[in-house]
UniProtKB/Swiss-Prot annotation:
Intracellular or extracellular location(s): Cellular thylakoid membrane
A GO cellular component annotation in the UniProt record: proton-transporting ATP synthase complex
First-listed, main subcellular location of the protein, grouped into a coarse class: membrane
Top-level taxonomic group: Bacteria
GO terms assigned for molecular function: lipid binding; proton-transporting ATP synthase activity, rotational mechanism
Task of the protein: F(1)F(0) ATP synthase produces ATP from ADP in the presence of a proton or sodium gradient. F-type ATPases consist of two structural domains, F(1) containing the extramembraneous catalytic core and F(0) containing the membrane proton channel, linked together by a central stalk and a peripheral stalk. During catalysis, ATP synthesis in the catalytic domain of F(1) is coupled via a rotary mechanism of the central stalk subunits to proton translocation.
One Pfam family here: ATP-synt_C
Name used for this protein in its record: ATP synthase subunit c
Length: 81
């Protein structure tokens, strides 16, 4: 494999992990903050808020996992080699 292609693949993998976890991380923080605020305002809706929060956190975490998969493909099953 060409050294330039290898370096570009490693850099792309690093960007995929970094940027792929930045957005969901911020989103998860905002979602958790909104859930805590909702619980403080309406404690009787705890079950409904918790269920919605867990589902939305799972969807956000899936985006991070997609970034990890892209990075692993670039590192170990390089399509450009």
């Amino acid at each position: 494999m060409d050294p330039l292609t290898s370096a570009a693949s490693v850099l792309s993998a690093a960007l995929a992990i970094g940027l792929g976890s930045l957005g969901p991380g911020l989103g998860q923080g905002n979602a958790a903050a909104a859930a805590m605020e909702g619980l403080a305002r309406q404690p009787e809706a705890e079950d409904k808020i918790r269920g919605n929060l867990l589902v939305s956190l799972a969807f956000m975490e899936a985006l991070t996992i997609y970034g990890l998969v892209v990075a692993l493909v670039l590192l170990f099953a390089n399509p450009f080699a």
